Amino acid sequence: MSDQKKEEEEEAAAAAAMATEGGKTSEPENNNKKPKTSGSQDSQPSPLALLAATCSKIGTPGENQATGQQQIIIDPSQGLVQLQNQPQQLELVTTQLAGNAWQLVASTPPASKENNVSQPASSSSSSSSSNNGSASPTKTKSGNSSTPGQFQVIQVQNPSGSVQYQVIPQLQTVEGQQIQINPTSSSSLQDLQGQIQLISAGNNQAILTAANRTASGNILAQNLANQTVPVQIRPGVSIPLQLQTLPGTQAQVVTTLPINIGGVTLALPVINNVAAGGGTGQVGQPAATADSGTSNGNQLVSTPTNTTTSASTMPESPSSSTTCTTTASTSLTSSDTLVSSADTGQYASTSASSSERTIEESQTPAATESEAQSSSQLQPNGMQNAQDQSNSLQQVQIVGQPILQQIQIQQPQQQIIQAIPPQSFQLQSGQTIQTIQQQPLQNVQLQAVNPTQVLIRAPTLTPSGQISWQTVQVQNIQSLSNLQVQNAGLSQQLTITPVSSSGGTTLAQIAPVAVAGAPITLNTAQLASVPNLQTVSVANLGAAGVQVQGVPVTITSVAGQQQGQDGVKVQQATIAPVTVAVGGIANATIGAVSPDQLTQVHLQQGQQTSDQEVQPGKRLRRVACSCPNCREGEGRGSNEPGKKKQHICHIEGCGKVYGKTSHLRAHLRWHTGERPFICNWMFCGKRFTRSDELQRHRRTHTGEKRFECPECSKRFMRSDHLSKHVKTHQNKKGGGTALAIVTSGELDSSVTEVLGSPRIVTVAAISQDSNPATPNVSTNMEEF
């Protein structure tokens, strides 16, 4: 220790003498001194000696070109950074600089003159330049020694006055091949592809060998950008450097592979497998600053967990388990430093699928205020591992060869629905029904198969998929020669029941036709051999005395069936039979039938059957409701001839009174919302409750004005408009002309309650002449 102290004192004295001489060359005997390692600096030199040595280096930039080269050793086991031929320790710590700046802190700054990397703290460099306006030339310090593992330190002084250092590593292989990394040329390392290998030396160091030694793996250095990292070197206290300990939680990273299929991008997870069993790897990356996405250089440290076997991830040794940790590099530049901490074994940086992990290094000269950034990305299999923005250790499981999952994507095809031909449908009860295309039933030939009952059912398939039946039921008919039903597109039921004859008159009870919609016209029917019923000639109805009176109509369905068309469920209802009186018929034959002689039965929805008793030979009347006023006093021969009949609306809360049944029926349709009168004008289709409303509406289409003013010959569509117009003439003349409007019926106060049948309106214009007792009266008759 005393010899070392003496040497340090001599170096300090020599530095002071050099400072007094004004920057002369240093003593050449210090150039051949051996480099010293860490751990033996116990005494600190005086600040005066340090200042003298620093000033001598600033004053003589070109005199130390022949000094010994600096070799920096990074010891991961102790966490120290050393200069090999200088008795000091360097430490890499972060500073509060703009960007990703690092500084080197010298723990024991020596006083010798060959310390080429020692600078006072006042001249430390950063990424942000000071405001000095002096422009000085760039100063460069480099060494020419070929010692393996050395670094070349280049001092760069910016025009602003700040000092920066570029540290260029000089690598040498085992065979003595020199590898020079030039930061100014990004294409100089393109030829190094596949020529650098990392071999564990067993002493916590790495040896770079040529690719022709083994066939393990390759370390690629590609895409070097022109970037430099400002390095600040100042004396300080040695603090052990933590290389692999990073605070924060561990985040799981899942590697996915984007695949574009048919315009759709899918992210498929990559499953890694080794031939006979693989090892897990851990890749840790330091957190990047908010300004950049990467850190200032990465260090790939291989730490095999199983040191008894080979640490290669090749399929030849499937039992190996390797942990790969990428932490922040402690090198002086942004170039990647590769250190293997394996005691035994060999690390190959290629995966089992022969896909190479590419380490991209980038360096740019720091000449502006922009941040110096180094883009170093570890790309296994062409995929990038996204870096977390927090100080967390990202853990990636790397297990052998990636195997892509096979995903089969089938293009969607449009469903083609074809028309289903008539086929059999299996019902729950086991019966099979053959569907038949829906078509009008034109002609049905019926023959007597049962003397008591004949039931004919024709199935049709509705558009909604349901099967409806057209039914014609004939009871108590012994023989039936021919029956034609035309335009019967809906389900219907016809029942003919013969009754006994009395007094030479045969009565037949006919059940009404049950439909679910439009009117049905029954044209002709041939009935023969019916008991107590003679042949009916439709052409001779007038002479035969056949009278078809009011037939009550209801909506019903065939027994055992329910029709669900349009969401309406129809239930079977009880129908009172209608009596048709037939008299004076003696073997009439069927002849020509004219349209005005056909018996037509119009069926309308909304009409209900009253519960009146049907008696043969009595005239039936249609009633709107079952109130006592509607049922009592029917006909003109009532008990009180002078009493006016009143028809009261039975709807709760209404109570309106009408003198005629037609008025009450129209009023009830207004309650139920039924509008059976539809305008058939093109593109109109409006519906009305009463027929007179429809007629009045049609005049708006035709433009017909039926009502003319007797004074000015103006014409109006409605009579109430004419009445208002006549009053204007009366007011102008001051009562000189009196108009009397007399109707043939009683008018209601409401316009909407006008009678549905035409009325005779008499308009009498009375004018005065010289003799007021004999006025002239002109009468105009208008029908509307």
From Swiss-Prot:
Gene3D superfamilies: Classic Zinc Finger
Gene Ontology terms, MF aspect: DNA-binding transcription factor activity, RNA polymerase II-specific; identical protein binding; RNA polymerase II cis-regulatory region sequence-specific DNA binding; sequence-specific DNA binding; zinc ion binding
Major location category of this protein: nucleus
CDD domains according to UniProt: SP4_N (cd22536)
An example Gene Ontology CC term for this record: cytosol
One of the GO biological process terms: regulation of transcription by RNA polymerase II
Polar residues bias: start-end ranges: 37-46, 109-120, 137-150, 291-301, 346-356, 381-390
Keywords of this entry: Activator, DNA-binding, Metal-binding, Nucleus, Phosphoprotein, Repeat, Transcription, Transcription regulation, Zinc, Zinc-finger
Entries under SUPFAM superfamilies matching the protein: beta-beta-alpha zinc fingers
Transmembrane intervals: none
Tissues expressing the protein: Abundant in brain.
PROSITE patterns: ZINC_FINGER_C2H2_1, ZINC_FINGER_C2H2_2
InterPro entries reported in the protein's UniProt record: Sp4-like, Znf_C2H2_sf, Znf_C2H2_type
Zinc finger (C2H2-type): 647-671, 677-701, 707-729
One matching Pfam family: zf-C2H2
Motif (9aaTAD): 467-475
Localization terms from the record: Nucleus
Region annotation (Disordered) ranges: 1-68, 109-150, 281-390
Domain notes: The 9aaTAD motif is a transactivation domain present in a large number of yeast and animal transcription factors. In SP4, the motif is inactive.
Family: Belongs to the Sp1 C2H2-type zinc-finger protein family.
Role according to the record: Binds to GT and GC boxes promoters elements. Probable transcriptional activator.
Name of the protein described by the UniProt record: Transcription factor Sp4
Organism for this UniProt entry: Homo sapiens (Human)
